[in-house]
Amino acid sequence: MNHDKSPIILIGFMGTGKSTIGKYVADEQNLSFIDIDSYIEEKYKLTIPEIFSKHGEQYFRNLEFTCLQECINTADIIATGGGIIESEEAFNFLKNQKNIIWLDCNIDIIYSRINDDPHRPNANNKTIKQLNDLYCSRNLRYNEIAFKKFDSHLLSISEIYYELLNLIKASDQY
């Protein structure tokens, strides 16, 4: 990556396809990709649920922000965790970045993807109404910092890929 360039940063609720699409675009374009959740798990040798359980959500949010700062100049594409905007520091940091792409999805589809997923501590044992409340509370923040929004339930991975490719070419960064 040219370190004078800004990475594409994927934001959005859990289960919207940030990791899948980020990896797909990176593979297709031979770009570097970092999934912040995976980066945290590898660096700290704990799963996200273990971090939540042992240290709490606020501790995890601090790690998430620290890792985002570490990765911002080393990756072409970054997939953030869905709750990264819960940290005021991370939110303000992201507000000052370029190329923030918000992946959104219908809550019913999200629920079917993440219901009972043991790797998602903020989704475990939640009803669809509880998950929808969390989803709605985060959407305003995603909207505030997003450069572009894609509805991942309306577009295929390849359609999102081509849209992102057009953005990459338009920014003439890669």
Curated annotation (Swiss-Prot):
Q: In which pathway does it act?
A: Metabolic intermediate biosynthesis; chorismate biosynthesis; chorismate from D-erythrose 4-phosphate and phosphoenolpyruvate: step 5/7
Q: Per its UniProt record, what Pfam families does this chain match? A: SKI
SUPFAM superfamilies listed in its UniProt record: P-loop containing nucleoside triphosphate hydrolases
Broad class of enzyme this protein falls into:
transferase
Alphabetical UniProt keywords: Amino-acid biosynthesis, Aromatic amino acid biosynthesis, ATP-binding, Cytoplasm, Kinase, Magnesium, Metal-binding, Nucleotide-binding, Transferase
What are the annotated GO cellular component locations? cytosol
Tell me its EC number(s), please.
2.7.1.71
Q: Which GO terms describe its molecular function?
A: ATP binding; magnesium ion binding; shikimate kinase activity
A single Gene Ontology biological process assigned to it is: amino acid biosynthetic process
Tell me where it mainly resides. Answer: cytoplasm
Q: Entry's CDD domains?
A: SK
The residues listed in the UniProt record as binding substrate, with positions renumbered to this chain, are 37, 61, 82, 138
Tell me which family the UniProt entry assigns to this protein: Belongs to the shikimate kinase family.
User: Know the name of this protein?
Assistant: Shikimate kinase
- Give the source species: Staphylococcus aureus (strain MSSA476)
Species lineage, top-down? Bacteria, Bacillati, Bacillota, Bacilli, Bacillales
